[in-house]
């Protein structure tokens, strides 16, 4: 019969996983800065260093930065001023977000929203394997999605310097 509803088709499909609680956690940020400056009418300097450590709200996500900056301004002659600026930063992080395809195109964030709450994290028939049977729903298990992305690291070193002579 077309349009008929089978009331027993969804038996056993009770809420068992709160995907938001499983995937999201409290983030944490530590940020430290120190600087020193001094000078007189002939020479001035400024030095600073910093450290930033952020642990993200998704498991395994983070961002760390070490930074250094130096500015020196020197009046060598009444007609010549020399300035030098240098800044360096070392950044490393893992955003934990890689876009998938199809129903997984939003990565972890959308899979948390779209994965049914009746789906268990682990496959009941295959211990230590993530559950992939969502009764016809084509979505990657959010926990598996996170596990696959934990080594998605980005590393960047930046050095910016300038020198100026002003006559």
Predicted regions and their residues:
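Surface-exposed loop/interface segments of Gram-negative outer-membrane beta-barrel transport/assembly proteins
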Residues: 1-16, 56-61, 67, 71-160
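Periplasmic N-terminal accessory/gating domains of Gram-negative outer-membrane beta-barrel systems
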Residues: 16-27
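Transmembrane beta-strand segments of Gram-negative outer membrane beta-barrel proteins
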Residues: 17, 42-49
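Outer-envelope beta-barrel architecture signal
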Residues: 30-32, 41-45, 78-82
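Transmembrane beta-strand segments that form the barrel wall of outer-membrane beta-barrel proteins
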Residues: 49-55
């Amino acid at each position: 019969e077309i349009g008929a509803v089978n009331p027993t088709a969804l038996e056993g499909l009770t809420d068992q996983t709160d995907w938001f609680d499983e995937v999201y956690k409290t983030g944490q940020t530590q940020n430290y800065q120190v600087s020193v400056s001094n000078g007189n009418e002939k020479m001035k300097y400024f030095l600073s260093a910093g450290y930033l450590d952020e642990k993200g709200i998704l498991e395994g996500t983070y961002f760390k930065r070490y930074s250094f900056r130096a500015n020196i301004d020197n009046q060598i002659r009444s007609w010549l001023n020399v300035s030098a600026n240098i800044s360096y930063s070392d950044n490393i992080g893992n955003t934990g977000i890689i876009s998938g395809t199809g129903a997984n195109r939003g990565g972890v964030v959308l899979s948390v929203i779209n994965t049914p709450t009746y789906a268990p994290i682990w496959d009941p028939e295959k211990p230590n394997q993530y559950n992939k049977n969502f009764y016809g729903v084509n979505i990657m298990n959010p926990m598996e999605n996170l596990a696959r992305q934990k080594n998605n690291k980005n590393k960047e070193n930046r050095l910016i310097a300038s020198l100026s002579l002003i006559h």
